[in-house]
Protein backbone atom coordinates (compact mmCIF):
# COMPACT_ATOMS: atom_id res chain seq x y z
CA UNK A 1 0.00 0.00 0.00
CA UNK A 2 2.78 2.41 0.81
CA UNK A 3 4.22 1.90 -2.61
CA UNK A 4 0.94 2.88 -4.28
CA UNK A 5 0.54 5.92 -2.06
CA UNK A 6 3.95 7.20 -3.10
CA UNK A 7 3.10 6.78 -6.75
CA UNK A 8 -0.19 8.65 -6.36
CA UNK A 9 1.45 11.51 -4.49
CA UNK A 10 4.08 11.84 -7.21
CA UNK A 11 1.63 11.64 -10.06
CA UNK A 12 -0.87 14.24 -8.86
CA UNK A 13 1.54 17.20 -9.21
CA UNK A 14 2.66 15.87 -12.58
CA UNK A 15 -0.93 15.64 -13.79
CA UNK A 16 -1.70 19.15 -12.55
CA UNK A 17 1.46 20.45 -14.21
CA UNK A 18 0.60 18.81 -17.52
CA UNK A 19 -2.95 20.16 -17.37
CA UNK A 20 -1.60 23.67 -16.74
CA UNK A 21 0.83 23.30 -19.64
CA UNK A 22 -2.01 22.20 -21.91
CA UNK A 23 -4.12 25.16 -20.83
CA UNK A 24 -1.21 27.57 -21.39
CA UNK A 25 -0.55 26.18 -24.85
CA UNK A 26 -4.23 26.43 -25.73
CA UNK A 27 -4.38 30.00 -24.46
CA UNK A 28 -1.30 30.89 -26.54
CA UNK A 29 -2.82 29.39 -29.68
CA UNK A 30 -6.17 30.98 -28.93
CA UNK A 31 -4.48 34.38 -28.72
CA UNK A 32 -3.97 34.26 -32.48
CA UNK A 33 -7.14 32.39 -33.39
CA UNK A 34 -9.02 29.35 -32.12
CA UNK A 35 -7.65 25.97 -33.13
CA UNK A 36 -10.98 25.15 -34.81
CA UNK A 37 -12.92 27.69 -36.85
CA UNK A 38 -16.12 26.89 -34.98
CA UNK A 39 -14.62 27.53 -31.53
CA UNK A 40 -15.37 30.71 -29.63
CA UNK A 41 -12.57 32.87 -28.20
CA UNK A 42 -13.15 35.49 -25.53
CA UNK A 43 -9.60 36.84 -26.00
CA UNK A 44 -10.13 38.35 -29.45
CA UNK A 45 -11.91 41.54 -30.54
CA UNK A 46 -11.83 42.13 -34.34
CA UNK A 47 -11.03 45.57 -35.75
CA UNK A 48 -10.76 46.94 -39.31
CA UNK A 49 -9.02 50.25 -39.88
CA UNK A 50 -9.90 52.20 -43.04
CA UNK A 51 -10.80 55.75 -44.00
CA UNK A 52 -14.37 54.82 -43.09
CA UNK A 53 -13.24 54.12 -39.49
CA UNK A 54 -9.59 54.80 -38.64
CA UNK A 55 -8.40 52.24 -36.07
CA UNK A 56 -11.73 50.42 -36.31
CA UNK A 57 -13.22 52.15 -33.29
CA UNK A 58 -16.19 50.30 -31.85
CA UNK A 59 -19.52 51.52 -33.17
CA UNK A 60 -18.03 54.34 -35.27
CA UNK A 61 -17.75 52.84 -38.75
CA UNK A 62 -19.22 54.48 -41.86
CA UNK A 63 -20.47 57.61 -40.08
CA UNK A 64 -19.87 60.02 -42.98
CA UNK A 65 -22.51 60.83 -45.62
CA UNK A 66 -25.41 59.68 -43.43
CA UNK A 67 -24.12 56.09 -43.26
CA UNK A 68 -23.81 55.81 -47.04
CA UNK A 69 -20.42 55.37 -48.72
CA UNK A 70 -18.73 58.48 -47.42
CA UNK A 71 -14.96 58.04 -47.17
CA UNK A 72 -13.72 54.95 -49.02
CA UNK A 73 -10.55 56.61 -50.32
CA UNK A 74 -8.31 59.63 -49.90
CA UNK A 75 -5.15 61.17 -51.37
CA UNK A 76 -1.56 61.64 -50.23
CA UNK A 77 -0.04 64.96 -51.20
CA UNK A 78 3.62 65.19 -52.13
CA UNK A 79 5.78 65.09 -49.01
CA UNK A 80 2.92 64.06 -46.72
CA UNK A 81 2.14 60.97 -44.64
CA UNK A 82 -1.06 58.96 -44.67
CA UNK A 83 -1.96 57.25 -41.40
CA UNK A 84 -3.42 53.76 -41.79
CA UNK A 85 -3.38 52.68 -38.15
CA UNK A 86 -2.48 54.18 -34.79
CA UNK A 87 -3.83 52.04 -31.99
CA UNK A 88 -3.03 50.72 -28.53
CA UNK A 89 -2.36 47.08 -27.76
CA UNK A 90 -2.04 44.32 -27.16
CA UNK A 91 -3.09 43.07 -30.55
CA UNK A 92 -2.10 41.33 -33.77
CA UNK A 93 -2.36 42.64 -37.32
CA UNK A 94 -3.53 39.79 -39.56
CA UNK A 95 -4.09 41.35 -42.97
CA UNK A 96 -3.31 44.53 -44.90
CA UNK A 97 -5.08 45.37 -48.17
CA UNK A 98 -4.28 48.49 -50.20
CA UNK A 99 -4.93 49.73 -53.70
CA UNK A 100 -3.69 52.97 -55.24
CA UNK A 101 -4.59 54.92 -58.35
CA UNK A 102 -1.09 55.03 -59.86
CA UNK A 103 1.10 51.93 -60.05
CA UNK A 104 4.05 53.07 -62.16
CA UNK A 105 7.53 51.82 -61.16
CA UNK A 106 8.39 55.29 -59.87
CA UNK A 107 5.28 55.35 -57.69
CA UNK A 108 5.82 51.87 -56.27
CA UNK A 109 9.35 52.87 -55.22
CA UNK A 110 8.52 56.50 -54.38
CA UNK A 111 5.98 55.55 -51.72
CA UNK A 112 7.32 54.12 -48.45
CA UNK A 113 5.45 51.99 -45.93
CA UNK A 114 6.54 52.47 -42.30
CA UNK A 115 5.49 50.44 -39.26
CA UNK A 116 6.20 51.31 -35.64
CA UNK A 117 5.68 49.19 -32.54
CA UNK A 118 5.36 50.20 -28.87
CA UNK A 119 5.73 53.96 -29.46
CA UNK A 120 9.24 53.63 -30.90
CA UNK A 121 10.41 56.61 -32.98
CA UNK A 122 12.36 54.46 -35.46
CA UNK A 123 10.23 52.26 -37.70
CA UNK A 124 10.68 48.49 -37.51
CA UNK A 125 9.53 48.38 -41.14
CA UNK A 126 10.59 50.99 -43.70
CA UNK A 127 10.37 49.61 -47.23
CA UNK A 128 9.37 50.87 -50.69
CA UNK A 129 5.64 50.26 -51.06
CA UNK A 130 5.73 47.88 -54.02
CA UNK A 131 8.69 45.86 -52.79
CA UNK A 132 7.10 45.31 -49.39
CA UNK A 133 4.11 43.55 -50.97
CA UNK A 134 6.20 40.83 -52.57
CA UNK A 135 7.34 42.07 -55.99
CA UNK A 136 10.40 44.20 -56.69
CA UNK A 137 11.58 46.36 -59.59
CA UNK A 138 8.61 48.72 -59.26
CA UNK A 139 6.43 46.11 -60.96
CA UNK A 140 3.23 44.24 -60.21
CA UNK A 141 2.22 40.66 -60.95
CA UNK A 142 -0.86 38.51 -60.53
CA UNK A 143 0.04 36.01 -57.81
CA UNK A 144 -0.73 34.45 -54.45
CA UNK A 145 1.72 32.88 -52.01
CA UNK A 146 1.72 32.17 -48.31
CA UNK A 147 2.46 35.79 -47.27
CA UNK A 148 1.27 38.06 -50.09
CA UNK A 149 -1.25 38.27 -52.91
CA UNK A 150 -2.21 40.49 -55.84
CA UNK A 151 -5.32 38.80 -57.31
CA UNK A 152 -5.60 40.80 -60.55
CA UNK A 153 -2.48 42.95 -60.52
CA UNK A 154 -4.26 45.98 -59.07
CA UNK A 155 -4.15 45.47 -55.29
CA UNK A 156 -1.65 44.70 -52.55
CA UNK A 157 -2.33 42.14 -49.82
CA UNK A 158 -0.19 41.06 -46.86
CA UNK A 159 -1.08 38.17 -44.56
CA UNK A 160 1.95 38.44 -42.29
CA UNK A 161 0.89 38.39 -38.65
CA UNK A 162 2.33 41.30 -36.68
CA UNK A 163 1.89 41.22 -32.89
CA UNK A 164 2.23 44.39 -30.82
CA UNK A 165 2.11 44.70 -27.05
CA UNK A 166 1.64 48.43 -26.39
CA UNK A 167 0.92 50.12 -29.72
CA UNK A 168 0.98 49.83 -33.51
CA UNK A 169 1.32 52.58 -36.10
CA UNK A 170 1.34 52.16 -39.88
CA UNK A 171 1.78 54.97 -42.40
CA UNK A 172 2.43 55.52 -46.10
CA UNK A 173 4.84 58.33 -46.96
CA UNK A 174 4.72 60.06 -50.36
CA UNK A 175 8.31 61.05 -51.15
CA UNK A 176 7.52 61.84 -54.79
CA UNK A 177 7.27 65.37 -56.15
CA UNK A 178 3.62 64.90 -57.14
CA UNK A 179 0.44 63.90 -55.33
CA UNK A 180 -1.03 60.41 -55.14
CA UNK A 181 -4.70 61.03 -55.84
CA UNK A 182 -6.22 57.70 -54.81
CA UNK A 183 -5.52 55.30 -51.95
CA UNK A 184 -7.95 52.78 -50.45
CA UNK A 185 -6.98 50.48 -47.57
CA UNK A 186 -8.01 48.05 -44.85
CA UNK A 187 -5.80 47.03 -41.93
CA UNK A 188 -7.47 44.06 -40.26
CA UNK A 189 -6.32 43.33 -36.73
CA UNK A 190 -7.52 41.96 -33.43
CA UNK A 191 -7.24 43.34 -29.93
CA UNK A 192 -6.17 40.84 -27.28
CA UNK A 193 -6.88 40.54 -23.58
CA UNK A 194 -3.65 38.61 -23.03
CA UNK A 195 -0.14 39.20 -24.37
CA UNK A 196 2.11 36.18 -24.89
CA UNK A 197 5.77 36.80 -23.99
CA UNK A 198 6.81 34.42 -26.77
CA UNK A 199 5.41 36.77 -29.40
CA UNK A 200 8.01 38.59 -31.51
CA UNK A 201 7.82 41.86 -33.44
CA UNK A 202 7.76 41.98 -37.22
CA UNK A 203 10.54 43.87 -39.04
CA UNK A 204 11.48 44.42 -42.69
CA UNK A 205 14.59 45.93 -44.29
CA UNK A 206 15.14 46.95 -47.93
CA UNK A 207 18.46 47.62 -49.61
CA UNK A 208 19.65 48.29 -53.16
CA UNK A 209 23.10 48.23 -54.71
CA UNK A 210 23.00 49.45 -58.31
CA UNK A 211 26.44 47.98 -59.03
CA UNK A 212 27.57 45.17 -56.76
CA UNK A 213 31.30 44.58 -56.29
CA UNK A 214 32.56 41.29 -57.75
CA UNK A 215 33.59 39.02 -54.88
CA UNK A 216 31.58 40.89 -52.22
CA UNK A 217 28.32 39.22 -51.25
CA UNK A 218 25.16 41.33 -51.40
CA UNK A 219 23.66 41.95 -47.96
CA UNK A 220 20.03 40.90 -47.94
CA UNK A 221 19.99 41.48 -44.18
CA UNK A 222 22.96 43.18 -42.47
CA UNK A 223 23.84 41.79 -39.07
CA UNK A 224 20.87 42.27 -36.75
CA UNK A 225 21.13 41.55 -33.02
CA UNK A 226 18.59 39.85 -30.79
CA UNK A 227 16.57 36.65 -30.70
CA UNK A 228 14.42 36.17 -33.74
CA UNK A 229 13.43 34.42 -36.92
CA UNK A 230 14.41 35.16 -40.51
CA UNK A 231 11.14 34.86 -42.39
CA UNK A 232 12.45 35.16 -45.94
CA UNK A 233 13.26 37.52 -48.78
CA UNK A 234 11.90 39.05 -51.95
CA UNK A 235 14.91 39.86 -54.15
CA UNK A 236 15.36 41.50 -57.55
CA UNK A 237 18.16 41.61 -60.10
CA UNK A 238 18.71 43.84 -63.12
CA UNK A 239 21.69 42.42 -64.97
CA UNK A 240 24.29 44.60 -66.65
CA UNK A 241 24.26 44.56 -70.49
CA UNK A 242 27.99 43.90 -70.75
CA UNK A 243 27.35 40.33 -69.55
CA UNK A 244 24.94 39.84 -72.49
CA UNK A 245 22.39 37.11 -71.81
CA UNK A 246 24.82 34.89 -69.92
CA UNK A 247 23.48 33.17 -66.82
CA UNK A 248 23.57 35.36 -63.70
CA UNK A 249 22.22 33.10 -60.94
CA UNK A 250 25.13 30.97 -59.68
CA UNK A 251 25.38 32.94 -56.42
CA UNK A 252 24.82 31.09 -53.16
CA UNK A 253 22.50 32.11 -50.31
CA UNK A 254 24.25 32.32 -46.93
CA UNK A 255 22.91 32.70 -43.37
CA UNK A 256 25.42 33.70 -40.69
CA UNK A 257 23.95 32.82 -37.31
CA UNK A 258 24.93 33.31 -33.66
CA UNK A 259 28.66 33.92 -33.81
CA UNK A 260 29.43 32.77 -37.36
CA UNK A 261 32.42 34.77 -38.59
CA UNK A 262 34.10 34.07 -41.92
CA UNK A 263 31.91 31.11 -42.80
CA UNK A 264 28.12 30.73 -42.41
CA UNK A 265 26.15 27.90 -40.88
CA UNK A 266 23.62 27.78 -43.72
CA UNK A 267 24.72 27.91 -47.35
CA UNK A 268 22.90 27.11 -50.58
CA UNK A 269 24.09 25.94 -54.00
CA UNK A 270 22.79 28.63 -56.38
CA UNK A 271 20.24 31.39 -56.73
CA UNK A 272 17.60 29.41 -58.61
CA UNK A 273 18.26 26.45 -56.32
CA UNK A 274 17.48 28.63 -53.29
CA UNK A 275 13.98 29.36 -54.62
CA UNK A 276 13.34 25.71 -55.43
CA UNK A 277 14.00 25.72 -59.18
CA UNK A 278 16.98 24.46 -61.23
CA UNK A 279 18.94 24.91 -64.46
CA UNK A 280 17.88 28.51 -65.01
CA UNK A 281 15.06 30.64 -63.66
CA UNK A 282 11.75 31.21 -65.40
CA UNK A 283 8.51 32.67 -64.13
CA UNK A 284 6.55 30.62 -61.57
CA UNK A 285 4.59 31.10 -58.36
CA UNK A 286 4.54 28.56 -55.52
CA UNK A 287 3.38 28.77 -51.95
CA UNK A 288 6.80 29.36 -50.38
CA UNK A 289 9.04 30.18 -53.34
CA UNK A 290 8.75 31.62 -56.80
CA UNK A 291 9.94 34.00 -59.51
CA UNK A 292 7.24 36.54 -60.39
CA UNK A 293 9.29 38.52 -62.92
CA UNK A 294 11.51 36.70 -65.42
CA UNK A 295 12.09 39.19 -68.22
CA UNK A 296 15.17 38.15 -70.15
CA UNK A 297 14.61 40.78 -72.84
CA UNK A 298 14.90 43.58 -70.28
CA UNK A 299 17.32 41.61 -68.06
CA UNK A 300 15.06 41.72 -64.97
CA UNK A 301 14.13 39.09 -62.40
CA UNK A 302 12.19 39.29 -59.13
CA UNK A 303 11.92 36.20 -56.93
CA UNK A 304 11.19 35.09 -53.37
CA UNK A 305 11.54 32.40 -50.75
CA UNK A 306 9.71 32.33 -47.43
CA UNK A 307 10.96 30.05 -44.66
CA UNK A 308 7.63 28.95 -43.21
CA UNK A 309 8.04 25.18 -43.04
CA UNK A 310 11.83 25.42 -42.69
CA UNK A 311 12.20 28.18 -40.05
CA UNK A 312 15.51 29.97 -39.55
CA UNK A 313 15.72 30.96 -35.87
CA UNK A 314 18.64 32.81 -34.31
CA UNK A 315 19.54 33.40 -30.67
CA UNK A 316 21.85 36.44 -30.77
CA UNK A 317 22.65 37.66 -34.29
CA UNK A 318 21.70 37.01 -37.92
CA UNK A 319 23.16 38.15 -41.24
CA UNK A 320 21.86 37.05 -44.66
CA UNK A 321 23.82 37.43 -47.90
CA UNK A 322 23.69 36.37 -51.55
CA UNK A 323 26.63 36.04 -53.90
CA UNK A 324 26.39 37.76 -57.28
CA UNK A 325 27.83 35.16 -59.60
CA UNK A 326 27.16 33.98 -63.13
CA UNK A 327 28.39 31.43 -65.62
CA UNK A 328 28.96 30.72 -69.30
CA UNK A 329 31.53 29.01 -71.50
CA UNK A 330 35.20 29.72 -70.96
CA UNK A 331 35.54 31.32 -74.39
CA UNK A 332 32.74 33.77 -73.57
CA UNK A 333 34.39 34.70 -70.28
CA UNK A 334 37.73 35.25 -72.03
CA UNK A 335 36.02 37.48 -74.61
CA UNK A 336 34.47 39.57 -71.84
CA UNK A 337 37.82 39.87 -70.07
CA UNK A 338 39.43 41.21 -73.24
CA UNK A 339 36.72 43.88 -73.41
CA UNK A 340 37.44 44.93 -69.83
CA UNK A 341 34.19 43.61 -68.35
CA UNK A 342 34.22 43.62 -64.55
CA UNK A 343 34.41 39.95 -63.52
CA UNK A 344 36.51 37.44 -61.55
CA UNK A 345 36.65 33.74 -62.60
CA UNK A 346 35.72 31.35 -59.79
CA UNK A 347 35.44 27.77 -61.05
CA UNK A 348 35.67 25.84 -64.30
CA UNK A 349 34.16 22.44 -65.00
CA UNK A 350 36.35 19.78 -66.53
CA UNK A 351 34.97 16.51 -67.90
CA UNK A 352 37.34 14.31 -65.91
CA UNK A 353 38.74 16.68 -63.30
CA UNK A 354 35.28 17.76 -62.11
CA UNK A 355 34.96 21.24 -60.64
CA UNK A 356 38.28 23.07 -60.70
CA UNK A 357 38.79 25.92 -58.20
CA UNK A 358 40.40 28.94 -59.87
CA UNK A 359 39.48 31.81 -57.53
CA UNK A 360 42.33 33.55 -55.70
CA UNK A 361 41.81 36.67 -53.60
CA UNK A 362 45.13 38.24 -54.61
CA UNK A 363 45.21 37.39 -58.34
CA UNK A 364 43.10 36.48 -61.37
CA UNK A 365 43.65 33.17 -63.13
CA UNK A 366 44.76 33.08 -66.77
CA UNK A 367 41.87 31.24 -68.44
CA UNK A 368 43.95 30.72 -71.58
CA UNK A 369 46.34 28.47 -69.70
CA UNK A 370 46.69 25.10 -71.52
CA UNK A 371 46.29 23.36 -68.17
CA UNK A 372 42.62 24.33 -68.00
CA UNK A 373 39.73 22.64 -69.86
CA UNK A 374 38.74 23.74 -73.36
CA UNK A 375 36.77 26.69 -74.71
CA UNK A 376 33.33 25.20 -74.05
CA UNK A 377 34.01 24.37 -70.38
CA UNK A 378 31.44 25.96 -68.07
CA UNK A 379 33.05 28.80 -66.12
CA UNK A 380 31.54 30.55 -63.11
CA UNK A 381 32.56 34.11 -62.33
CA UNK A 382 31.81 36.92 -59.90
CA UNK A 383 29.99 39.78 -61.62
CA UNK A 384 28.45 43.19 -60.94
CA UNK A 385 24.70 43.72 -61.24
CA UNK A 386 21.89 45.90 -59.88
CA UNK A 387 20.50 43.98 -56.89
CA UNK A 388 17.82 44.85 -54.33
CA UNK A 389 15.98 42.86 -51.68
CA UNK A 390 13.52 42.99 -48.82
CA UNK A 391 14.41 40.96 -45.72
CA UNK A 392 11.40 39.96 -43.62
CA UNK A 393 12.13 38.89 -40.05
CA UNK A 394 10.92 38.80 -36.46
CA UNK A 395 12.80 40.11 -33.42
CA UNK A 396 12.18 39.88 -29.69
CA UNK A 397 12.17 43.69 -29.55
CA UNK A 398 10.19 46.42 -31.34
CA UNK A 399 13.16 48.22 -32.92
CA UNK A 400 16.37 47.36 -34.76
CA UNK A 401 19.68 49.10 -35.41
CA UNK A 402 19.65 48.74 -39.19
CA UNK A 403 20.31 51.70 -41.52
CA UNK A 404 17.47 53.99 -42.58
CA UNK A 405 15.83 53.42 -45.95
CA UNK A 406 17.83 54.69 -48.93
CA UNK A 407 16.69 57.92 -50.55
CA UNK A 408 14.23 58.10 -53.42
CA UNK A 409 16.97 58.75 -56.00
CA UNK A 410 18.61 55.41 -55.25
CA UNK A 411 15.28 53.61 -54.98
CA UNK A 412 14.00 54.88 -58.35
CA UNK A 413 17.26 54.98 -60.33
CA UNK A 414 16.60 53.87 -63.95
CA UNK A 415 12.90 53.22 -63.28
CA UNK A 416 10.06 54.57 -65.42
CA UNK A 417 8.69 57.86 -64.13
CA UNK A 418 5.22 59.34 -64.59
CA UNK A 419 4.90 63.12 -64.46
CA UNK A 420 1.58 62.87 -62.60
CA UNK A 421 -0.95 60.29 -61.46
Language model: regions and residue ranges:
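Bacterial Sec-dependent signal peptides at the C-terminal "C-region" and cleavage site
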Residues: 14-30
Amino acid sequence: MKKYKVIIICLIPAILYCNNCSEDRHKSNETIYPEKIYEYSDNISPRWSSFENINGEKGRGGMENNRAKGHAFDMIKSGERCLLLDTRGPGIINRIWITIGGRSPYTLRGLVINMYWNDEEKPAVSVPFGDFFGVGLGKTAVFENTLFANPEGRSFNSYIQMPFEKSAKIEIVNEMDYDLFLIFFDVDYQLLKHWDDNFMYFHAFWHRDTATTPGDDFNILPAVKGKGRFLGTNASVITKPEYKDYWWGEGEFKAYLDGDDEYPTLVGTGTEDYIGSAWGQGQFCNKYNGCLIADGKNRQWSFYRYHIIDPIYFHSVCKITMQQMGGTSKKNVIAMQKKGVNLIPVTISGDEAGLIHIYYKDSVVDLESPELPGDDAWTNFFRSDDVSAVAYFYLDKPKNDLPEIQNINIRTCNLKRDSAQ
